[in-house]
């Protein structure tokens, strides 16, 4: 039977991608249905209890700048906040927060249940309704059918999921949850390329059985960082430390002696695992010269005794896991409360997607999260938001939107996936972006909030705060430009005390702030340039914009030059055999990838600069040289 009301957008799956997709579509005014196999696990942190990190924190800030949920949720649930790379430049500084799993899940569920235009329904989905190469709905486990103009698949590791502990394995979406086998079979019937990937998680330890007195503590930062541009530190719950231990030669011997019982090394697991979050057995074998690996003991929450040992993800048998854990300092008497495991699951080639994350083959069907070959909550959330907003736009008969590589890490993520694809779980790093100085955590709102407002994602409260911040930045920069001090002025001695070389000529506040030894806080502590802005976010922007002005201007010039060709569109139906002068290899790759633009084509392995020049000349001759806005 059909449900009585049709929807504009259906989201299948309630993880980090699904919740952002549902919130985005509903915020844009579309009637949205979120289908999940269990309402109690909405926003569940299936692996590590943390949000953010290098590259990942940038994505969270971008999701927040577009009105998303993740940053707000972690501000309410974070039990330790730190800025990574704090001593380095602003481009690579990144926020990371340890999370209380229960508080995080509660924050997500509360937001979803109070979002207008959003209905949540508990039922596993087993089928899609596809008519004339367009998706028009979904069918649940009990045969209930829902109609919609667009469907977003955010199913995580559930598609034909298989859990491995030692040489034993069983079907599962994650520990304690069933897999989605009928939906996996249905998707394999569609004209989509599918492969298998693998990820894993470490055993969880009972904190009461760890001797923390012999371990180094790691505390959060003070003052505490905040994730959301709308947040403040007063929202954070109680803060707690993490602890550090290490593997040792005894640990490594245990692992080496039991490799024949590892499903990965015994050839039982076919899927490829994450390069940048390898299992402990993988680390020991790949880095054989290392006699120890650092392990972070992270609390799972304020009301839980479980500890997450970050760094020993494993699928070795339980008895071996016990030996590994007890070989480390402070863990000699530790007890495991949940065994570690590996999980294999289906993923679909993201090169079959448009930059909007809509399928090239099934109209109205969108993919986001681990189903696209990524790993990580943050990567999933960013894709979920993009897929959700584009599903909403499609259901309203509007053109899709995707950020450029020069505009956001989300743009880098989507372009990498849709252009290059991936053979292993993809995670974000700042090194993946060409224009890191422009794509900082601190300016995510300046880059994206205006677009978020145009798209209908940003509410009035966030918009007012954003404009207030812009005004504060502009007003303060004008004040510093127009406030001067001369070498003979009474205030010169106070200024010179902060400078490595004294004033030799008249200088404005901005001139002084450009000096590497002068900070905004120091400058505005001087009588001549007081007071400082109360708006800390605006003050940070003033300092960065002034100090890095020349570098930023140079990078902006590079972006503008690159964009002239980057945005040149390539016809979706073009058969590249028509373009004379291209090699057979280039023709095959272009016909296989079907890039949407010259920029995408240029990033395909094997497509040379000479081939790009030939394409541009051919497009001009054919009168097909068009650029996207």
UniProtKB/Swiss-Prot annotation:
One of its GO terms (biological process) is tRNA wobble uridine modification. NAD(+) binds at residues 273-287. GO terms for cellular component: cytosol. FAD binds at residues 13-18, 125, 180, 370. InterPro entries: FAD/NAD-bd_sf, GIDA_C_N, MnmG, MnmG-rel, MnmG-rel_CS, MnmG_C, MnmG_C_subdom, MnmG_C_subdom_sf. Keywords: Cytoplasm, FAD, Flavoprotein, NAD, tRNA processing. It comes from the Bacteria. Gene3D superfamilies: FAD/NAD(P)-binding domain, GidA associated domain, C-terminal subdomain, tRNA uridine 5-carboxymethylaminomethyl modification enzyme MnmG/GidA. Its cofactor is FAD. GO terms for molecular function: flavin adenine dinucleotide binding. The keyword Chaperone does not apply. Its main location: cytoplasm. NAD-binding protein involved in the addition of a carboxymethylaminomethyl (cmnm) group at the wobble position (U34) of certain tRNAs, forming tRNA-cmnm(5)s(2)U34. PANTHER family: GLUCOSE INHIBITED DIVISION PROTEIN A, PROTEIN MTO1 HOMOLOG, MITOCHONDRIAL. Homodimer. Heterotetramer of two MnmE and two MnmG subunits. Belongs to the MnmG family. This is tRNA uridine 5-carboxymethylaminomethyl modification enzyme MnmG. The gene is mnmG.
